[in-house]
């Protein structure tokens, strides 16, 4: 009788032990499922940025904005390779001499019929280049997300867009307009530091951060009509700002779950 009771006790004890062990294993597996390896992802980006000019660029323009598209490949080791194209737009001018010789004291332009014209001056341009960088995940729950450092290099161009809606001023037509638009271009390098987030459900994928762009540019017009001279000086065009990107990811395959 004593042995039977002892056997029954040991049986119950072993049963509870097995159940507890199974529960522990299930908990470990459930936990491991949450830990994912990094994926290879193709990214199609919609990019928006606000930039503040510095150095030579600040003498010509005020705050500007960028909107563009990009494509990037994120490897399983979280390295990034890509390319982008961005439009530049702005409406604040600081080039005081522009149209000075055909303006009234009130800042308007008079056409041949003696009518006052409010000629619009805007910043227009674009940036295109190649990108390389890396994501540094620090939360094991999502190996695709984390702080990001991205370098870019390529070509930039901008000019002053002179808008004469009625096309009624001869000095602002065709070849004459080129003497005022300050067409400028050259090479640039850009650094971006921010945070990249890829959602587990793949629906919300964004990045945001700060960018610093340095352009090695030069005016490309042979003659500036408002200054009555040429301008061959090398320029340092700097843009410092904030960038936000919306990412449409295409995964090579479904995210793998790693069991330990």
Tell me what each language-model feature is:
Residues 1-37, 251-260:
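Cleavable N-terminal export/targeting peptides
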Residues 21-76, 80, 84, 245, ...:
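Short glycine/proline- and aromatic-enriched beta-strand/turn motifs that initiate or cap beta-hairpins
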Residues 31-41, 77-78, 138-146, 198-206, ...:
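Short loop/turn motifs that connect adjacent beta-strands in outer-membrane beta-barrel proteins
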Residues 33-35, 55-60, 91-125, 158-186, ...:
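Extracellular/periplasm-exposed beta-strand and loop segments of Gram-negative cell-envelope proteins
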Residues 40, 63-67, 122-128, 145, ...:
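Residues that define the transmembrane beta-barrel architecture of outer-membrane proteins
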Residues 46, 50, 69-73, 85, ...:
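Residues on the lipid-exposed face of transmembrane beta-strands in outer-membrane beta-barrel proteins
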Residues 82, 122-161:
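Internal, conserved structured core segments that host functional sites
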Residues 191, 197-260:
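Predominantly the C-terminal beta-signal and adjacent terminal strand-loop region
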